[in-house]
């Protein structure tokens, strides 16, 4: 584990076969980047889907520290989240889905909470 005041964001994805996937995914990633240095890494655990893999591998994460993990088993949200936590390097994690966005102040007070709850 690294700095105890950083957060790993876990993003499990089952499929890209949603009509608005690319737009949702882009907005989600931008909302993560807007959190600043508090987010140390983005861990994407995605299902073995060629369309999804093509999109993720061609996406410009623009300097965001990204770990990619292909989930080969039957899609299972909880197992994908657990795998993301296993390979994350921060003491703190946050979960987001591809069709969600963090508000610009989502992690604003996180440093205060991390100071209080060090363990």
Describe each PLM feature range:
Residues 105-119:
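Conserved donor NDP-sugar-binding/catalytic core segment of glycosyltransferases
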Residues 27-39:
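Short, acidic, metal-binding catalytic loop of nucleotide-sugar glycosyltransferases
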Residues 6-10, 41:
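Cell-envelope/extracellular polymer assembly enzymes that use nucleotide-activated donors
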